[in-house]
């Protein structure tokens, strides 16, 4: 199966998210319905950095979870069976944070599905920076 890639414009045709809440810049690997790998480049101009935390900017953990969910949504919603639908984050388990993500970092975000039954999908995700684990965990998705 050919691995696909998506630029920001193509991602915005799949996901309803827009600035400041679109948290994936590119998909560099895509196996529809199975897995996706995305990139998020963190700029000092991200809207969350001034308040989290002043003088010590750190990407909020909940936004890292959302970034993994958005990459997963790209994977599932590119499958012909699910095109045109919405993906909702329905649950998280065993999320662990190993290091901080700060301005200038490039996040490598991988999400893959382990099971899909009906309108519910189960998967796992992780974020790495320069091969170093930032965070990871398990997800539950609902399709609307």
UniProtKB/Swiss-Prot annotation:
Main location group: cytoplasm
Bilayer-spanning residue ranges: none
Claim: RNA-binding is one of the keywords in the record: no
Residue ranges of coiled coil: none
Biological process according to GO: fatty acid biosynthetic process; lipid A biosynthetic process
Record has Lipid metabolism as a keyword: yes
GO (cellular component) term, any one: membrane
Cellular localisation: Cytoplasm
Listed SUPFAM superfamilies: Thioesterase/thiol ester dehydrase-isomerase
EC numbers for this chain: 4.2.1.59
Its biological purpose: Involved in unsaturated fatty acids biosynthesis. Catalyzes the dehydration of short chain beta-hydroxyacyl-ACPs and long chain saturated and unsaturated beta-hydroxyacyl-ACPs.
Alphabetized HAMAP family for the sequence: FabZ
NCBIfam families reported for this sequence: fabZ (TIGR01750), PRK00006.1 (NF000582)
Protein name: 3-hydroxyacyl-[acyl-carrier-protein] dehydratase FabZ
């Amino acid at each position: 199966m050919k691995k696909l890639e998506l630029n920001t414009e193509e991602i915005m045709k799949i996901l309803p998210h827009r600035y400041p809440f679109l948290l994936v810049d590119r998909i560099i690997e895509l196996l529809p319905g199975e897995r996706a790998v995305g990139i998020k480049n963190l700029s000092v101009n991200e809207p969350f950095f001034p308040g989290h935390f002043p003088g010590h900017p750190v990407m909020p953990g909940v936004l890292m979870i959302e970034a993994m969910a958005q990459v997963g949504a790209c994977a599932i919603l590119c499958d012909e069976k699910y095109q045109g639908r919405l993906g909702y984050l329905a649950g998280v388990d065993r999320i662990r944070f190993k290091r901080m993500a700060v301005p200038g970092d490039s996040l490598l975000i991988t999400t893959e599905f382990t099971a899909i039954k009906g309108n519910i999908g189960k998967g796992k995700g992780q974020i790495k920076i320069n091969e170093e684990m930032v965070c990871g965990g398990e997800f539950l998705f609902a399709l609307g």
